[in-house]
Amino acid sequence: MSYGDGEQPPVSETPEPKDDTNNPVFNLPPLLVGILAALLVAYVVPAYLLSEDGSNWFIFTFGFIPLRYAVPFSQQGLEWLWTPVSYSFLHGGIEHILFNGLWLMAFGAPVLRRIGTLRFVLLWCISAAVSAFGHAALNWGDVTVLIGAS
């Protein structure tokens, strides 16, 4: 194509590259930062701050135990209400919480951004409860404690 009479070819302007010097290394949604903090607190408190009896109480109170659903609710405390979700915040060791946290950052952040805060919280709670009750169905009446979402 020729350009006559002093016409110039169209010039495409390329945008200047953005200055990336102020971007954070981890750009995690606030809810995910809060969940990671809760996971850390739920690990540090029984592992390092409580006595052995206190740690056992913490795990028993917030861990999922299938036996709770084989015994009438009138014969026990209210732990059966929150343990289908609270167990997912507990971890058995530093490696357990470290790898779960890394996977949560890698895969949880895009899911959270895609589906939003409310749906993410519902996804967490429903999937934790379904997993817990699946465990209970396979281990009905068992006294072992289920901890961790992995």
Q: What is each of the regions a protein language model found here?
A:
Residues 1-40:
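C-terminal transmembrane module of polytopic alpha-helical membrane proteins
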Residues 35, 41-147:
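N-terminal TM1-TM2 helical hairpin plus the immediately adjacent luminal interfacial "cap"
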